[in-house]
C-alpha cells in the first residue's frame, strides 16, 4: 500500500513528486518487491541497458536483495565459484551440470546482495527477500530444475541471450558499510548505484528523515508498525510500502520498526 496508488498519483500531481534526480528516467525508476520463495526459483540473469535496449527495446536490470527472513540452512545462488569460459558455461547448461560451478551462499536474516546486470542469480527455497530493482522485466532464464509449465512442457530457457550477457566470474559484492547511530534510530547504507540508493533503518523510538527536492523516499516496512508523519500521517504494517513525495521536507517515522529506505541519487 502507498499513500496513493502510485501511478495514478503521479499522473494526477505530476512527475515533480519524483524529484529532480528522476528526470533522467523515462518511467518511474524502480520496482520494489517482496519475494517469498517456497521452492528454488529459476537461475537467471538480466542484461545491461545497452544490450536490453538493442535486443529487447527496453531497459536492463540491476537489483539488490535484502534477506528479510529465511529457514535454517537456506541458500541462494550468486555468481560463480570461479571464472569459467563461455564454452564451459554453454556445455554445463546443456548437460545440466551448471550448479556444480555456481556459488551457493548460505544466508541469514539481514544479508544483502547487490546484483549488477550480468550477474547469475537465483533465490533458494525458504527465503523471504526484499528486492529493489530497476523498473524492467527483462529476464533470461538459464536453468529451471527441469520444471514444466501449465502446458506440460519445460519452461522456456533463454540460453543464447544468457551466453551473450552473463559475467562468467564470481559476483561483485557491494562493500560492507558501517552502521550510523542517530538519535532514536540507526541507519546503514546497503547499496548505491545510478539507479537507486538503499538503506536499512532500525528505529527504536523515532527517526527524523527528509525527502528533499532531489528524490522521493520509499519506505518498505520489514518489522513493526510505524507511523509516518510529514505532509500527512499514515500508519504502516510489515510488508507495506509508503511513498513520500520529493519536496515533502522533514518527516518522522515513529515506533519500533525496521524498514528499507530507497531514493534516487
Language model: regions and residue ranges:
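Double-stranded beta-helix
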Residues: 78-100, 130-172, 262-265
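Long, hydrophobic, well-ordered secondary-structure blocks that form the structural core
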Residues: 44, 50-90, 94-95, 99-107, ...
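A short glycine-rich, His/Asp/Glu-containing loop-to-beta-strand
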Residues: 8-16, 29-56, 61-64, 176-208
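Short acidic-glycine-tyrosine-enriched beta hairpin
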Residues: 102-114, 230-248
Amino acid at each position: 500500500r502507498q499513500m496513493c496508488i502510485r501511478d495514478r498519483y503521479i499522473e494526477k500531481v505530476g512527475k515533480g513528486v519524483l524529484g529532480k534526480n528522476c528526470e533522467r528516467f523515462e518511467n518511474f525508476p524502480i520496482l520494489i518487491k517482496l519475494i517469498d520463495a517456497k521452492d528454488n526459483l529459476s537461475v537467471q540473469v538480466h542484461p545491461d541497458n545497452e544490450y536490453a535496449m538493442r535486443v529487447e527495446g527496453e531497459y536492463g536490470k540491476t537489483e539488490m536483495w535484502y534477506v528479510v527472513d529465511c529457514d535454517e540452512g537456506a541458500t541462494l545462488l550468486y555468481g560463480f565459484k570461479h571464472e569459467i569460459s563461455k564454452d564451459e558455461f554453454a556445455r554445463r547448461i546443456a548437460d545440466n551440470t551448471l550448479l556444480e560451478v555456481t556459488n551457493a551462499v548460505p544466508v541469514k536474516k539481514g544479508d544483502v546482495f547487490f546484483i549488477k546486470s550480468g550477474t547469475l542469480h537465483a533465490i533458494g527455497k525458504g527465503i523471504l527477500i526484499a528486492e529493489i530493482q530497476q523498473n524492467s522485466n527483462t529476464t533470461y532464464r538459464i536453468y529451471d530444475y527441469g520444471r514444466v509449465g501449465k502446458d506440460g512442457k519445460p519452461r522456456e530457457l533463454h540460453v543464447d541471450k544468457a551466453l551473450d550477457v552473463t559475467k562468467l566470474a564470481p559476483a561483485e559484492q557491494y562493500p560492507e558499510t558501517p552502521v550510523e547511530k542517530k538519535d532514536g534510530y540507526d541507519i546503514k547504507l546497503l547499496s548505491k548505484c545510478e539507479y537507486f540508493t538503499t538503506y536499512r533503518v532500525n528505529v527504536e523510538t523515532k527517526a527524523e528523515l527528509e525527502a528533499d527536492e532531489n528524490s522521493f523516499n520509499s519506505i518498505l516496512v520489514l518489522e513493526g508498525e510505524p507511523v509516518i508523519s510529514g505532509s500527512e500521517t499514515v500508519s504502516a504494517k510489515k510488508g507495506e510500502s509508503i511513498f513520500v513525495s520529493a519536496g515533502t521536507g522533514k518527516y518522522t517515522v515513529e515506533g519500533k520498526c525496521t524498514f528499507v529506505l530507497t531514493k534516487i541519487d
